[in-house]
Amino acid sequence: MLGHYNKKQNKMDENNIKIIGTHHFQDKKDIEEHIDSFNPDIILIELCNGRISMMNNPEQKQKQKFSILGLISKSVNKKAKKEGKEFGSDLKSAYRMAKEKNIKIGLIDRPLVETNVFFKAVPLSEKVAMLNELRKFSNKSIKIEDIINEVENTETEDILKQLKQKCPEIFYYLITSRDEYMINKIKGYLYDNQGKRILIFIGKGHEKKIKDNLGFNQTK
């Protein structure tokens, strides 16, 4: 059956399953092209109910308690808006277009509340290092376009390796543990929707691990 995930063989029929790794400033038109060309029955997105709620009710962001994750998001958003861009435009566009086209949606990211709780376990030294990097980012004349170019022209593995070396615990909670969470969510959707065309939008940093785990690009 097309689109069937074979747990035993850990292989994936790629005819009906497609994973798109995006950077979080991706143009709306790029997302739309992926959706229109693949014509999915279901779209799985690296979002959670908490993020959807904040998308629909921006004032909720103001009521959030202080967190380093929130500070990072606020800092990037501020710089992005100055350049006429929107942080998270890729996933937001995928969600909104799926709604407009009446395509079934699956949210696969770990709830934001849980991520923030786990993040408290990060050592103070790494949090300070992250805040220092954030301060440099805010003060520098780095443009969002420069960041996009670096992401598009640098091996994702190299970028992840740098983060892991500098902040191993942050890397675990932001990347590794979320990879595992999303893999399990995706497998559940694939098992429950065999034969359906499923399009999956995730950040580039998660793409390789998830594809490898699901058996993409493996010889049968």
Model-found features: residue ranges?
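Compositional signal for N-terminal targeting/processing segments
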Residues: M1-K220
